[in-house]
Amino acid sequence: MQIILLEKIGGLGNLGDIVTVKNGYARNFLIPAGKAKRATEANMKEFEARRAELEAKQAEILADARARQEKLDGQTVTVAQKAGVDGRLFGSVTNADIAAAIVAAGIEAVKANVRLPNGPLKAVGEYEVEVALHTDAVAKITVAVVAATE
């Protein structure tokens, strides 16, 4: 199915691009989420009429993400978790735990934005973690996993 992108989507294209995607991806995700419209003549004309408005909105969203990236870059977030004497955790530190620690530090974050390429953290130590605030704004933070003291 051919669609018009209403915002930048990583791995797919930029605002205003006409791309071909699988029908289910368009019908079940992109169109209901307001990220795309079918590429019909009427929708293309409507998009061209609203292009400046949509570009301004996307620029505002990117500026907000870049501002949050500036606050977040280089920050160290500490997460306390029960651990054994050998430094292995009784459980793991997930992206939800890291997002909660970032929010506790006073910066807005969602667990879906926290990228853990090697899966959940399972040992005490310091880890480099990426927080994808936007496709063009990715902050790198340090997560310090410490043994919880009771």
Swiss-Prot record:
It comes from the Bacteria. One of its GO terms (cellular component) is ribosome. GO terms for biological process: translation. Transmembrane segments: none annotated. Keywords: Ribonucleoprotein, Ribosomal protein, RNA-binding, rRNA-binding. HAMAP family: Ribosomal_bL9. Binds to the 23S rRNA. This is Large ribosomal subunit protein bL9. It comes from Neisseria meningitidis serogroup C (strain 053442). The gene is rplI.
